[in-house]
Structure formats: C-alpha cells, structure tokens
Amino acid sequence: MPHSSDSSDSSFSRSPPPGKQDSSDDVRKVQRREKNRIAAQKSRQRQTQKADTLHLESEDLEKQNAALRKEIKQLTEEMKYFTSVLSSHEPLCSVLAPGAPSPPEVVYSTHAFHQPHVSSPRFQP
C-alpha cells in the first residue's frame, strides 16, 4: 500500500501550507471586495445620471405643458371673440336671412385675400 500513500503525499504537496492558504484567501477576498466596491460605485453613478436625466426631461415637459396651456387659453379667448363677432353678425347678415336672394358672384382681387374680413386689434394676422 505504499503506492496509495504516495498519492496522498502528492496531494499534500499541491496544496499550500495552511498559513499560506489563509493569506491567499485574504488576498482574493480583498480583491473581490475592491471589485465589488468599484462596481457598486459605478452603479450609483449610473443611477444618479439616470435620475438627473429624468429630472431634466421632467422640467422640459413641464415647460412644454405650460406653453401648451397658455396657447389653449389664448385660442379659447380668440374663439370666444370670434363667436361673439359671429353672433353679432348673424342677425344682420343678408346671406343668412330667410327668403334673401342668392348672393351675387363676387370677384376678388388677389389683394382682397390679404385683408381680414373682421378687423380685430387683438387678433391681427
């Protein structure tokens, strides 16, 4: 059975002595911790960058939203104005009066198309 003892002797010779193995494990543990620390730091940086990007995007969307709300308000006011003008015009309009003759064909010069039908100091083209 000396042959089996040789194989066990060779297995002992391959593994480092107990003190040296602990030191090797410690080095690997320190390296793993350092690698993990760096990965965690990069992850936090990416997370912060993503949060900053989302914050800027949110601010831009808030500005767009405010501008669109302002435009809606202006268009609503313009619609109210033109509705009022139309309501004032309808009772006087000969085209809409019952039994009124058909309106004559009107030939406009190209210049007439650039003139507003209703002049409004608030809504000039």
Curated annotation (Swiss-Prot):
One of its GO terms (biological process) is regulation of transcription by RNA polymerase II. Residues 54-75 are annotated as: Leucine-zipper. The modification Phosphothreonine is found at T48. It holds the Pfam family bZIP_1. Residues 1-58 are annotated as: Disordered. Residues 26-89 form the bZIP domain. The keyword Cytoplasm applies. The modification Phosphoserine is found at S43. SUPFAM superfamilies: Leucine zipper domain (SSF57959). Keywords: Activator, Cytoplasm, Differentiation, DNA-binding, Nucleus, Phosphoprotein, Repressor, Transcription, Transcription regulation. InterPro entries: AP-1, bZIP, bZIP_sf. GO terms for molecular function: DNA-binding transcription factor activity; DNA-binding transcription factor activity, RNA polymerase II-specific; RNA polymerase II cis-regulatory region sequence-specific DNA binding; sequence-specific DNA binding. It is found in: Nucleus; Cytoplasm. GO terms for cellular component: cytoplasm; nucleus. PROSITE patterns: BZIP, BZIP_BASIC. AP-1 family transcription factor that controls the differentiation of lineage-specific cells in the immune system: specifically mediates the differentiation of T-helper 17 cells (Th17), follicular T-helper cells (TfH), CD8(+) dendritic cells and class-switch recombination (CSR) in B-cells. Acts via the formation of a heterodimer with JUNB that recognizes and binds DNA sequence 5'-TGA[CG]TCA-3'. Belongs to the bZIP family. This is Basic leucine zipper transcriptional factor ATF-like. The lineage of its organism: Eukaryota, Metazoa, Chordata, Craniata, Vertebrata. The gene is BATF.
